[in-house]
Amino acid sequence: MNTENRPSLPCPFDKVHPSQLVRDDEFYMWQAYNLAIDAWRQDEVPIGAVIELGGEIIAAAHNQRDRTRDPTAHAEILALGQASSAVGDWRLTGATLYVTKEPCPMCSGATLMSRLKRVVYAVPDPKMGCLGGATDLNSLPQSNHHLEIARGVLEKPCLELLRAYFQLKRAAD
């Protein structure tokens, strides 16, 4: 689908800038939320992701499938690539991925393969989520790595953002 001539949907949401003093799960999820707003403003599905290691954000991305015409350009995949470059290794031991929606099968597999310590997501996805939603790749007994999972961090604002985007998108199409 050609998206170059389509008008982008105005985003009615504002970015949130939490205090830098407390760098907890909510702090990092707000960063991912702000990236999801950036995605919306670029007419992409509003999903954002950041990767934290040692209290610092080493990667930050949002969906870019339409802009890049690449079906793998999900926020999580892009952030994993950035993080691997930042640390100089594909193993992201000790790092945490924060993402505004539960990862799909592709992204869930990539998070496991990258050896992240944790994944924190806001909105569960019972249709395509693979870290506890539709299925749970993390619970495969034969896997040689398992993630710590935290669900529902800032679920309400992230869900409101996704719902509003798709409601406006359907109305515009």
How would you name each of these model-derived features?
Residues 43-47, 93:
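Short, basic and Ser/Thr-rich N-terminal targeting/leader segments
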Residues 32, 36-39, 49, 59, ...:
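Small-residue (primarily alanine) positions within well-ordered alpha-helices
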Residues 1-39, 103-173:
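Zinc-dependent deaminase
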Residues 47-55:
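Short beta-strand scaffold segments in enzyme catalytic cores
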Residues 65, 99, 123:
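Residues that line or immediately flank small-molecule/substrate-binding pockets and catalytic motifs
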Residues 58-65, 148:
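Short beta->alpha transition motifs characteristic of CBS
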Residues 67-77:
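A short, polar/charged loop-to-alpha-helix boundary motif
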Residues 89-102:
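Immediate flanking context of iron-sulfur cluster ligation sites
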